[in-house]
């Protein structure tokens, strides 16, 4: 149950596009865009996206919000460095949250297999908010 999320970012009046196939999680921070594809977490620093170095955080997240359906849960948490992390997670794929070596891990199911993704900087309060959102 993948979906394509298309981003647009205005660069000097030009609107380049990038389509990303998202399986379970899409995470956007002020510096990075992460997404799951084929059961693996992919991460790219913004400046590595060819001509996308001037991507706007608010622009990206607002477009994802418009494209997200009821099947996706939008989480917004603030990490220990006071940076906002936005998670867009398929509701039916969320398994839970785990903690290992001081880092939290989001656990999701992908094709019948449980996978976990480390979320660096996620505070205890932020982790609690994630769990509470899925318990509602």
Positions of predicted regions on the chain:
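Acidic, Ser/Thr- and proline-rich intrinsically disordered linker/docking segments
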Residues: 2-17, 23-136
């Amino acid at each position: 149950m993948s979906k394509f999320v298309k981003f647009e970012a205005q660069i000097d009046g030009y609107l380049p596009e990038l389509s990303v196939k998202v399986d379970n999680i899409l995470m956007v921070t002020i510096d990075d865009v992460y997404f799951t594809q084929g059961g693996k977490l992919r991460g790219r620093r913004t400046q590595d996206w060819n001509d996308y170095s001037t991507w706007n955080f608010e622009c990206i997240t607002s477009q994802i919000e418009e494209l997200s359906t009821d099947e996706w849960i939008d989480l917004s948490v603030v990490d220990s460095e006071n940076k906002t992390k936005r998670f867009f997670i398929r509701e039916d794929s969320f398994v839970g949250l785990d903690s290992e070596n001081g880092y939290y891990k989001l656990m999701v199911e992908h094709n019948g297999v449980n996978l976990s993704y480390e979320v660096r900087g996620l505070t205890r309060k932020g982790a609690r908010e994630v769990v509470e959102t899925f318990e509602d």
